[in-house]
């Protein structure tokens, strides 16, 4: 008589739970977003703009520290 409840409890523990529809949808959305992010390619113009911005900041810092950088830019 005790075997049947124990068997049912073990069966419930061993069986996979039904996936929650909301969790399943969130997981699929996250997977889709990750795949889209992986497929994105950085535009070459964006990279050039970033490098130009960094070099402008570096020139400003260099001009504050020494005049040599500013003289090189004027030539």
Swiss-Prot record:
Q: Single GO molecular-function term?
A: ion channel inhibitor activity
What are the record keywords, sorted? Disulfide bond, Neurotoxin, Pyrrolidone carboxylic acid, Secreted, Signal, Toxin
Q: Which GO terms describe its cellular component?
A: extracellular region
Q: Which organism is it from?
A: Conus ventricosus
Q: What is its main location?
A: secreted
Record-given protein name: Conotoxin Vn5.5
Q: In which tissues is it expressed?
A: Expressed by the venom duct.
Q: What is known of its domains?
A: The cysteine framework is V (CC-CC).
- Excised during maturation, the propeptide residues are 20-59
Family assignment?
A: Belongs to the conotoxin T superfamily.
Modification Pyrrolidone carboxylic acid occurs at: 60
Where is it localised? Secreted
The question of whether S-adenosyl-L-methionine is a record keyword is answered with no
Q: How is it modified after translation?
A: Contains 2 disulfide bonds that can be either 'C1-C3, C2-C4' or 'C1-C4, C2-C3', since these disulfide connectivities have been observed for conotoxins with cysteine framework V (for examples, see AC P0DQQ7 and AC P81755).
Record has Disulfide bond as a keyword = yes
The positions making up the signal sequence are 1-19
Q: What is the lineage of its organism?
A: Eukaryota, Metazoa, Spiralia, Lophotrochozoa, Mollusca
Instruction: Check the record and name the InterPro entries matching this protein.
Output: Conotoxin (IPR004214)
């Amino acid at each position: 008589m005790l075997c049947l409840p124990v068997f049912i409890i073990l069966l419930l523990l061993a069986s996979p739970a039904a996936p929650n529809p909301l969790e399943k949808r969130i997981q699929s959305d996250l997977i889709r977003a990750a795949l889209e992010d992986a497929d994105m390619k950085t535009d070459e113009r964006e990279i050039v703009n970033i490098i130009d911005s960094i070099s402008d900041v570096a020139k400003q810092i260099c001009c504050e520290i020494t005049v040599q950088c500013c003289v090189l830019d004027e030539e």
